[in-house]
A protein has these predicted regions:
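Acetyl-CoA-dependent GNAT
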Residues: 8-12, 19-74, 79, 92
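Conserved N-terminal entry element of GNAT/NAT acetyltransferase domains
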Residues: 1-12, 153-156
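Alpha-helical elements of the RecA-like P-loop NTPase motor core of helicases
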Residues: 15, 117-118
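Conserved catalytic-core motifs of GNAT/GCN5-like acyltransferases
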Residues: 108-110, 121, 125-145
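Short hydrophobic/aromatic beta-strand or adjacent loop that forms the aromatic wall/cage
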Residues: 46, 143-149
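Conserved acetyl-CoA-binding loop-helix of GNAT-fold acetyltransferases
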Residues: 84-97
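Short, well-ordered beta-strand micro-motif
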Residues: 50-52, 148-152
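Conserved GNAT acetyl-CoA-binding A-motif
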Residues: 99-112
Length: 156
């Protein structure tokens, strides 16, 4: 596998990042009459990362601030050809490092994929704190709720 590097997202990276998110049914969508408050309506470029291999974007993730010391992760996705190669862990580590440097102490994550829930708990020390109903079909179409996880960054 090619060497993978993680860096901050640039505007020119958006089409590739959106393509990868779309592969997992996680692309942001604008508000509409049918879905006035979508799960994700955009990507905050200042808080977004990409993983790159051989000049090609192979993964993306971001986060947004909920308060001075609270943040929520947003849509980590990896090109299926690179799944299982550690790209997701590199992206997650980059965003957690940046959050720590910004003074974030508490991180919230929502996911609907059982393997991703296990990954967050076992690899990063998250704990499951509840569920939230989905606003519309996003990510897995047959799951109508998010599992909510939290991570105490001050303990790591």
């Amino acid at each position: 596998m090619s060497e993978v590097t993680v860096r901050k997202m640039r505007e020119a990276d958006l089409p590739a990042a959106l393509r990868i998110l779309g592969l997992w049914n996680m692309a942001p969508r604008p508000p509409s009459a049918d879905v006035p408050d979508p799960e994700r309506s955009g990507i905050e470029l200042a808080n977004a990362f990409v993983a790159e291999a051989d000049g090609r974007i192979v993964g993306t993730c971001s986060y947004f601030m909920l308060g001075d010391d609270w943040a929520e992760t947003a849509s980590l996705a990896v090109d299926p050809a690179f799944k299982g190669g550690g790209v997701g862990a590199l992206l997650q580590a980059a965003r957690l490092d940046e959050m720590r440097h910004r003074g974030v102490r508490h991180v919230r994550t929502e996911t609907d994929r059982p393997e991703t829930i296990r990954w967050y708990v076992e690899r990063f020390g998250y704990r499951i704190v509840g569920t939230n109903p989905k606003k519309h079909t996003f990510s897995l179409p047959d799951v109508d709720y998010w599992t909510v996880l939290e991570l105490d960054l001050s303990a790591n």
